[in-house]
Protein backbone atom coordinates (compact mmCIF):
# COMPACT_ATOMS: atom_id res chain seq x y z
CA UNK A 1 0.00 0.00 0.00
CA UNK A 2 2.69 2.54 0.98
CA UNK A 3 4.57 2.03 -2.27
CA UNK A 4 1.68 3.65 -4.13
CA UNK A 5 2.94 6.97 -2.73
CA UNK A 6 5.76 6.91 -5.27
CA UNK A 7 4.92 4.13 -7.70
CA UNK A 8 1.73 5.75 -8.97
CA UNK A 9 3.32 9.14 -9.64
CA UNK A 10 3.94 9.72 -13.31
CA UNK A 11 7.59 9.65 -14.38
CA UNK A 12 9.23 10.97 -17.54
CA UNK A 13 8.94 8.43 -20.32
CA UNK A 14 11.89 10.11 -22.03
CA UNK A 15 14.76 12.47 -21.28
CA UNK A 16 16.21 14.19 -24.34
CA UNK A 17 19.78 15.54 -24.35
CA UNK A 18 20.50 18.13 -27.05
CA UNK A 19 24.17 19.10 -27.40
CA UNK A 20 23.87 21.73 -30.17
CA UNK A 21 27.14 20.33 -31.57
CA UNK A 22 29.09 21.71 -28.61
CA UNK A 23 30.78 20.18 -25.57
CA UNK A 24 30.07 23.31 -23.51
CA UNK A 25 26.33 23.77 -24.14
CA UNK A 26 23.48 21.32 -23.67
CA UNK A 27 19.71 21.30 -23.26
CA UNK A 28 17.96 18.61 -21.22
CA UNK A 29 14.22 18.04 -21.65
CA UNK A 30 12.26 15.76 -19.28
CA UNK A 31 8.54 15.07 -19.66
CA UNK A 32 5.96 14.35 -18.38
CA UNK A 33 6.25 15.19 -14.68
CA UNK A 34 3.58 15.56 -12.02
CA UNK A 35 2.39 19.14 -11.55
CA UNK A 36 4.90 21.01 -9.39
CA UNK A 37 7.67 18.47 -9.89
CA UNK A 38 9.18 20.46 -12.75
CA UNK A 39 9.91 23.33 -10.37
CA UNK A 40 11.01 20.99 -7.56
CA UNK A 41 13.47 19.04 -9.69
CA UNK A 42 14.59 21.97 -11.83
CA UNK A 43 15.50 24.13 -8.84
CA UNK A 44 17.23 21.28 -7.00
CA UNK A 45 19.27 20.24 -10.03
CA UNK A 46 20.24 23.84 -10.79
CA UNK A 47 21.53 24.46 -7.27
CA UNK A 48 23.53 21.23 -7.19
CA UNK A 49 24.93 21.79 -10.69
CA UNK A 50 26.25 25.21 -9.73
CA UNK A 51 27.53 24.40 -6.25
CA UNK A 52 28.50 20.77 -5.85
CA UNK A 53 30.27 19.37 -8.90
CA UNK A 54 34.03 19.04 -8.56
CA UNK A 55 36.51 20.61 -10.94
CA UNK A 56 39.96 22.19 -11.15
CA UNK A 57 41.08 25.82 -10.88
CA UNK A 58 44.12 28.01 -10.25
CA UNK A 59 44.47 28.73 -6.52
CA UNK A 60 47.61 30.91 -6.52
CA UNK A 61 50.13 32.55 -8.86
CA UNK A 62 53.69 33.73 -8.40
CA UNK A 63 55.07 36.27 -10.89
CA UNK A 64 58.80 36.92 -11.04
CA UNK A 65 59.63 40.37 -9.67
CA UNK A 66 56.15 40.92 -8.18
CA UNK A 67 55.58 41.07 -4.41
CA UNK A 68 51.82 41.72 -4.29
CA UNK A 69 48.79 42.01 -6.55
CA UNK A 70 48.80 45.84 -6.54
CA UNK A 71 52.08 45.98 -8.44
CA UNK A 72 52.73 46.77 -12.08
CA UNK A 73 55.21 45.04 -14.37
CA UNK A 74 57.45 47.04 -16.73
CA UNK A 75 56.49 46.40 -20.35
CA UNK A 76 53.24 44.64 -19.45
CA UNK A 77 50.13 46.61 -20.36
CA UNK A 78 47.90 45.07 -17.70
CA UNK A 79 48.59 45.58 -14.02
CA UNK A 80 48.79 42.56 -11.73
CA UNK A 81 45.19 42.95 -10.56
CA UNK A 82 43.94 42.59 -14.15
CA UNK A 83 46.28 39.66 -14.75
CA UNK A 84 44.89 37.87 -11.69
CA UNK A 85 41.33 38.47 -12.94
CA UNK A 86 42.29 36.93 -16.29
CA UNK A 87 43.93 33.95 -14.57
CA UNK A 88 40.66 33.20 -12.76
CA UNK A 89 39.01 32.58 -16.15
CA UNK A 90 41.41 29.83 -17.24
CA UNK A 91 39.39 26.63 -17.76
CA UNK A 92 41.24 23.52 -16.58
CA UNK A 93 40.61 19.80 -16.58
CA UNK A 94 42.72 17.70 -14.19
CA UNK A 95 42.39 13.93 -13.97
CA UNK A 96 44.25 13.36 -10.71
CA UNK A 97 44.34 15.17 -7.38
CA UNK A 98 46.27 18.38 -6.73
CA UNK A 99 48.06 20.51 -6.07
CA UNK A 100 49.95 20.70 -9.37
CA UNK A 101 52.24 23.36 -10.87
CA UNK A 102 52.07 25.07 -14.26
CA UNK A 103 54.56 27.57 -15.68
CA UNK A 104 54.47 30.17 -18.43
CA UNK A 105 57.42 32.18 -19.68
CA UNK A 106 57.29 34.53 -22.65
CA UNK A 107 59.09 37.49 -24.18
CA UNK A 108 57.47 40.43 -25.95
CA UNK A 109 56.13 41.79 -28.05
CA UNK A 110 52.99 39.68 -28.08
CA UNK A 111 50.02 38.34 -26.20
CA UNK A 112 50.34 35.75 -23.44
CA UNK A 113 47.48 33.26 -23.66
CA UNK A 114 46.47 30.20 -21.67
CA UNK A 115 47.84 28.10 -24.51
CA UNK A 116 51.37 29.30 -23.66
CA UNK A 117 51.21 27.60 -20.26
CA UNK A 118 53.39 24.52 -19.84
CA UNK A 119 51.27 21.86 -18.14
CA UNK A 120 52.00 18.48 -16.58
CA UNK A 121 50.59 15.25 -18.01
CA UNK A 122 47.17 15.10 -16.36
CA UNK A 123 46.37 18.84 -16.59
CA UNK A 124 44.69 20.22 -19.71
CA UNK A 125 43.91 23.83 -20.63
CA UNK A 126 40.44 23.96 -22.19
CA UNK A 127 40.47 27.58 -23.44
CA UNK A 128 44.00 28.04 -24.84
CA UNK A 129 42.96 31.20 -26.70
CA UNK A 130 42.13 33.00 -23.41
CA UNK A 131 44.28 36.15 -23.01
CA UNK A 132 46.26 36.57 -19.77
CA UNK A 133 48.29 39.71 -20.54
CA UNK A 134 50.00 41.70 -23.33
CA UNK A 135 53.76 42.30 -23.56
CA UNK A 136 55.50 45.25 -25.22
CA UNK A 137 58.82 45.09 -27.07
CA UNK A 138 61.60 43.89 -24.77
CA UNK A 139 59.25 42.85 -21.96
CA UNK A 140 59.48 39.42 -20.35
CA UNK A 141 57.24 37.61 -17.89
CA UNK A 142 57.42 34.35 -15.98
CA UNK A 143 54.52 33.04 -13.90
CA UNK A 144 54.06 29.87 -11.89
CA UNK A 145 50.51 28.70 -11.16
CA UNK A 146 49.24 26.37 -8.45
CA UNK A 147 46.29 24.23 -9.57
CA UNK A 148 44.04 22.20 -7.30
CA UNK A 149 40.72 20.39 -7.32
CA UNK A 150 37.62 21.23 -5.30
CA UNK A 151 33.98 22.23 -5.58
CA UNK A 152 32.04 25.46 -5.66
CA UNK A 153 33.65 28.86 -5.14
CA UNK A 154 36.59 29.44 -2.79
CA UNK A 155 37.67 33.09 -2.15
CA UNK A 156 41.32 34.08 -2.35
CA UNK A 157 41.75 34.56 1.41
CA UNK A 158 40.95 30.87 1.96
CA UNK A 159 43.61 29.93 -0.61
CA UNK A 160 46.28 31.84 1.31
CA UNK A 161 48.56 29.39 3.13
CA UNK A 162 50.10 30.48 6.44
CA UNK A 163 53.59 29.49 5.29
CA UNK A 164 53.19 30.95 1.79
CA UNK A 165 56.37 32.57 0.42
CA UNK A 166 56.49 36.29 -0.26
CA UNK A 167 55.09 37.06 -3.70
CA UNK A 168 52.65 34.13 -3.83
CA UNK A 169 49.32 35.73 -4.74
CA UNK A 170 46.18 33.74 -3.84
CA UNK A 171 43.42 33.64 -6.47
CA UNK A 172 39.65 33.26 -6.16
CA UNK A 173 38.93 29.70 -7.34
CA UNK A 174 35.77 28.78 -9.22
CA UNK A 175 36.03 25.00 -9.23
CA UNK A 176 32.59 24.29 -10.62
CA UNK A 177 32.76 23.09 -14.23
CA UNK A 178 29.23 24.42 -14.71
CA UNK A 179 29.10 28.10 -15.63
CA UNK A 180 25.39 28.76 -16.16
CA UNK A 181 22.15 26.87 -15.59
CA UNK A 182 18.64 28.03 -16.39
CA UNK A 183 15.37 26.14 -16.54
CA UNK A 184 11.79 26.67 -17.59
CA UNK A 185 8.57 24.82 -16.88
CA UNK A 186 5.88 24.30 -19.51
CA UNK A 187 2.66 22.32 -19.70
CA UNK A 188 2.72 19.04 -21.57
CA UNK A 189 0.11 16.43 -22.44
CA UNK A 190 -0.01 12.78 -21.51
CA UNK A 191 -3.13 10.96 -22.67
CA UNK A 192 -6.13 13.08 -21.74
CA UNK A 193 -4.27 15.08 -19.07
CA UNK A 194 -3.08 18.46 -20.37
CA UNK A 195 -1.35 20.02 -17.36
CA UNK A 196 1.63 17.81 -16.60
CA UNK A 197 5.02 19.55 -16.31
CA UNK A 198 7.73 19.67 -18.95
CA UNK A 199 11.17 20.58 -17.57
CA UNK A 200 13.80 22.15 -19.85
CA UNK A 201 17.31 22.70 -18.44
CA UNK A 202 19.88 24.78 -20.31
CA UNK A 203 23.45 24.13 -19.15
CA UNK A 204 26.75 25.80 -20.00
CA UNK A 205 30.01 24.21 -18.83
CA UNK A 206 33.68 25.06 -19.24
CA UNK A 207 34.19 21.94 -21.37
CA UNK A 208 35.73 19.75 -18.67
CA UNK A 209 32.42 17.88 -18.43
CA UNK A 210 29.50 17.58 -20.85
CA UNK A 211 26.08 18.91 -19.92
CA UNK A 212 24.63 15.39 -20.01
CA UNK A 213 27.23 14.07 -17.58
CA UNK A 214 26.86 17.12 -15.33
CA UNK A 215 23.12 16.46 -14.95
CA UNK A 216 23.81 12.79 -14.23
CA UNK A 217 26.33 13.68 -11.50
CA UNK A 218 23.95 16.23 -9.95
CA UNK A 219 21.10 13.71 -9.91
CA UNK A 220 23.38 11.13 -8.28
CA UNK A 221 24.34 13.65 -5.57
CA UNK A 222 20.67 14.35 -4.84
CA UNK A 223 19.89 10.63 -4.80
CA UNK A 224 22.68 9.99 -2.31
CA UNK A 225 21.70 12.90 -0.05
CA UNK A 226 17.99 12.01 0.00
CA UNK A 227 18.50 8.30 0.66
CA UNK A 228 19.28 9.02 4.33
CA UNK A 229 15.68 10.14 4.86
CA UNK A 230 14.20 6.81 3.72
CA UNK A 231 13.54 4.93 6.97
CA UNK A 232 12.00 1.72 5.61
CA UNK A 233 12.92 -1.20 3.42
CA UNK A 234 11.56 -1.32 -0.08
CA UNK A 235 8.40 -3.47 -0.05
CA UNK A 236 9.16 -6.75 -1.76
CA UNK A 237 6.89 -7.94 -4.52
CA UNK A 238 5.93 -11.58 -4.36
CA UNK A 239 7.60 -13.22 -7.29
CA UNK A 240 5.01 -15.11 -9.30
CA UNK A 241 5.72 -18.80 -9.47
CA UNK A 242 6.85 -19.77 -12.91
CA UNK A 243 4.21 -21.76 -14.66
CA UNK A 244 5.61 -24.65 -16.65
CA UNK A 245 3.38 -25.12 -19.65
CA UNK A 246 1.93 -28.56 -20.33
CA UNK A 247 3.66 -30.15 -23.29
CA UNK A 248 1.62 -31.73 -26.04
CA UNK A 249 4.29 -34.42 -26.42
CA UNK A 250 6.74 -36.56 -24.46
CA UNK A 251 9.55 -34.35 -23.02
CA UNK A 252 12.04 -37.02 -24.14
CA UNK A 253 11.51 -35.79 -27.70
CA UNK A 254 13.43 -32.62 -26.73
CA UNK A 255 16.60 -34.62 -26.22
CA UNK A 256 19.22 -34.16 -28.92
CA UNK A 257 20.14 -37.20 -31.00
CA UNK A 258 23.85 -36.61 -30.39
CA UNK A 259 23.19 -37.56 -26.75
CA UNK A 260 22.13 -41.06 -27.83
CA UNK A 261 24.78 -43.75 -27.71
CA UNK A 262 24.95 -44.27 -31.47
CA UNK A 263 27.84 -45.38 -33.63
CA UNK A 264 29.85 -42.68 -35.38
CA UNK A 265 28.42 -43.71 -38.76
CA UNK A 266 24.81 -43.47 -37.59
CA UNK A 267 25.40 -40.16 -35.80
CA UNK A 268 27.03 -38.66 -38.90
CA UNK A 269 24.13 -39.76 -41.09
CA UNK A 270 21.62 -38.08 -38.78
CA UNK A 271 23.72 -34.92 -38.76
CA UNK A 272 23.88 -34.94 -42.57
CA UNK A 273 20.07 -35.18 -42.70
CA UNK A 274 19.73 -32.21 -40.26
CA UNK A 275 18.07 -34.38 -37.61
CA UNK A 276 18.78 -32.61 -34.31
CA UNK A 277 16.16 -33.77 -31.79
CA UNK A 278 14.60 -37.16 -31.12
CA UNK A 279 11.30 -35.51 -32.08
CA UNK A 280 12.76 -34.90 -35.53
CA UNK A 281 13.96 -38.49 -35.78
CA UNK A 282 10.82 -40.43 -34.84
CA UNK A 283 8.72 -38.64 -37.46
CA UNK A 284 10.88 -40.20 -40.15
CA UNK A 285 9.74 -43.49 -41.69
CA UNK A 286 12.09 -46.42 -42.28
CA UNK A 287 11.97 -45.76 -46.01
CA UNK A 288 12.92 -42.11 -45.53
CA UNK A 289 15.81 -43.07 -43.30
CA UNK A 290 17.15 -45.59 -45.82
CA UNK A 291 17.22 -42.86 -48.48
CA UNK A 292 19.75 -40.94 -46.35
CA UNK A 293 23.25 -41.14 -47.93
CA UNK A 294 25.49 -43.82 -46.36
CA UNK A 295 22.63 -44.96 -44.09
CA UNK A 296 22.12 -48.73 -44.22
CA UNK A 297 20.17 -51.49 -42.52
CA UNK A 298 22.72 -51.80 -39.73
CA UNK A 299 22.32 -48.14 -38.76
CA UNK A 300 18.52 -48.44 -39.08
CA UNK A 301 18.38 -51.42 -36.71
CA UNK A 302 20.66 -49.63 -34.26
CA UNK A 303 18.37 -46.59 -34.14
CA UNK A 304 15.21 -48.71 -33.88
CA UNK A 305 16.72 -50.54 -30.92
CA UNK A 306 17.64 -47.30 -29.11
CA UNK A 307 14.19 -45.80 -29.72
CA UNK A 308 12.45 -48.99 -28.55
CA UNK A 309 14.31 -48.76 -25.23
CA UNK A 310 12.65 -45.34 -24.80
CA UNK A 311 9.19 -46.57 -25.79
CA UNK A 312 9.42 -44.85 -29.18
CA UNK A 313 9.56 -45.92 -32.83
CA UNK A 314 9.99 -44.46 -36.30
CA UNK A 315 6.97 -43.14 -38.19
CA UNK A 316 5.28 -41.52 -35.19
CA UNK A 317 3.16 -38.39 -35.63
CA UNK A 318 3.72 -35.52 -33.17
CA UNK A 319 1.26 -32.62 -33.03
CA UNK A 320 2.74 -29.08 -32.72
CA UNK A 321 6.26 -30.15 -33.64
CA UNK A 322 8.66 -28.45 -33.70
CA UNK A 323 7.68 -25.89 -31.02
CA UNK A 324 8.78 -22.27 -31.63
CA UNK A 325 10.89 -22.09 -28.47
CA UNK A 326 12.39 -25.54 -28.76
CA UNK A 327 15.80 -24.59 -27.32
CA UNK A 328 14.26 -23.00 -24.21
CA UNK A 329 11.97 -25.99 -23.73
CA UNK A 330 14.90 -28.37 -24.06
CA UNK A 331 16.74 -26.59 -21.25
CA UNK A 332 13.61 -26.45 -19.06
CA UNK A 333 12.77 -30.14 -19.38
CA UNK A 334 16.29 -31.61 -19.50
CA UNK A 335 15.85 -33.09 -16.01
CA UNK A 336 12.82 -35.08 -17.21
CA UNK A 337 14.56 -37.12 -19.91
Curated annotation (Swiss-Prot):
Entry-linked SUPFAM superfamilies: C-terminal domain of RNA polymerase alpha subunit (SSF47789), Insert subdomain of RNA polymerase alpha subunit (SSF56553), RBP11-like subunits of RNA polymerase (SSF55257)
Domain comment quoted from the record: The N-terminal domain is essential for RNAP assembly and basal transcription, whereas the C-terminal domain is involved in interaction with transcriptional regulators and with upstream promoter elements.
Catalytic reaction list: RNA(n) + a ribonucleoside 5'-triphosphate = RNA(n+1) + diphosphate
Matches recorded under InterPro entries: DNA-dir_RNA_pol_insert, DNA-dir_RNA_pol_RpoA/D/Rpb3, DNA-dir_RpoA, RBP11-like, RNAP_asu_C, RNApol_insert_sf
Keyword Transcription in record: yes
Group of enzyme by EC: transferase
Molecular function terms from GO: DNA binding; DNA-directed RNA polymerase activity; protein dimerization activity
Sequence segments annotated as region (Alpha N-terminal domain (alpha-NTD)): 1-233
Protein name, as recorded: DNA-directed RNA polymerase subunit alpha
EC number: 2.7.7.6
Segments for region (Alpha C-terminal domain (alpha-CTD)): 249-337
GN (gene name): rpoA
Protein family per UniProt: Belongs to the RNA polymerase alpha chain family.
Function field: DNA-dependent RNA polymerase catalyzes the transcription of DNA into RNA using the four ribonucleoside triphosphates as substrates.
This protein's UniProt keywords: DNA-directed RNA polymerase, Nucleotidyltransferase, Transcription, Transferase
Species assigned in the record: Brucella suis (strain ATCC 23445 / NCTC 10510)
One Pfam match: RNA_pol_A_bac
Annotated Gene Ontology cellular component terms: cytoplasm; DNA-directed RNA polymerase complex
Complex formation: Homodimer. The RNAP catalytic core consists of 2 alpha, 1 beta, 1 beta' and 1 omega subunit. When a sigma factor is associated with the core the holoenzyme is formed, which can initiate transcription.
GO biological process, one term: DNA-templated transcription
Amino acid sequence: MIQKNWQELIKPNKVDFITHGSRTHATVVAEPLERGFGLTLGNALRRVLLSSLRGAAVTAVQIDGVLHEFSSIPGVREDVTDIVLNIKEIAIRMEGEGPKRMVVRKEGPGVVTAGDIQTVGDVEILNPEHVICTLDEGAEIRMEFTVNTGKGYVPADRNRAEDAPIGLIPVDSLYSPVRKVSYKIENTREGQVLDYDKLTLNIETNGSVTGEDAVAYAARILQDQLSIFVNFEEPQKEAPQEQVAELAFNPALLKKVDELELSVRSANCLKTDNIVYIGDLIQKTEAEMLRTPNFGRKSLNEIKEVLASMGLHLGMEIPAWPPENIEDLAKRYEDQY
